[in-house]
Design a protein with these regions (language model features):
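Soluble, non-membrane globular domain cores that form compact, hydrophobic packing
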Residues: 1-205
Length: 205
């Protein structure tokens, strides 16, 4: 007997919905134009629409599996209203070297630190070098507080906390290069090449 199970998860904001969706999607999946974004695999169709993350699973649907899932998904999407879009801040990630659909949203404890709150990340590969970029969005006061606590946590000596670039020797993540400007902190992980990290920190601006 053929059947389809639909699970609809409502989140606090579209960004939080994207966060869970982004943790589960595969960057090389078969993506679809449904909701803000969706993808289909055998017996599975997941998509994001507004503040909702929708997951469909099919059973015994045979050769028409994908068509059946898509028809169900379209109906659900229509009933949930405005489809929204992927978080606008994702457009700030430089395109060069970025792995398509590798962007993620970490809701809390970025890098394992409670004071770093939430962050968006994306995976990169350039000339055989794999690395990760991130951006944190907050207000200016909180950004300053995050920088200060990070410096204290890693026992980095910095008397005056001001906007600009920082190099932090993190005992768990190695050297982290970041830039604070206004309500944003952005940075790069896993890069030892000075020119490469400078290039990408600049591209974020």
């Amino acid at each position: 007997k053929a059947s389809v199970i639909v699970d609809v998860y409502r989140h606090k904001t579209p960004t939080h919905a994207f966060g869970i969706y982004s943790q589960e999607r595969l960057s090389d999946a078969n993506f679809l134009d449904i909701g803000a974004q969706g993808y289909v695999e055998k017996n599975v169709l997941n998509f994001l629409t507004g503040s909702y993350y929708v997951k469909l699973n099919s059973f015994n649907t045979g050769a028409e599996d994908e068509e059946i899932l898509l028809n169900f998904a379209k109906k659900v999407s229509e009933n949930l209203g405005e489809k929204g879009r992927l978080p606008f801040i994702l457009s700030s990630f430089p395109e060069e070297g970025k792995k398509k659909n590798s962007e993620k949203f970490i809701n809390k404890n970025f890098l394992g630190y409670s004071f770093l709150h939430s962050a968006f990340t994306a995976d990169y590969e350039l000339s055989g070098t794999k690395f990760k970029l991130f951006v944190i969005e907050s207000d200016r006061k909180e950004c300053k507080d995050m920088i200060q606590k990070y410096l204290q946590q890693t026992k980095s000596l910095e008397k005056n906390i001001a906007e600009g670039r920082y190099t932090i020797s993190d005992p768990y993540h190695g050297e982290i290069f970041l830039h604070w400007k206004g309500k944003y902190i952005w940075g790069i992980l896993n890069v030892s090449d000075i020119s490469l990290r400078s290039k990408y920190l600049k591209l974020f601006e």
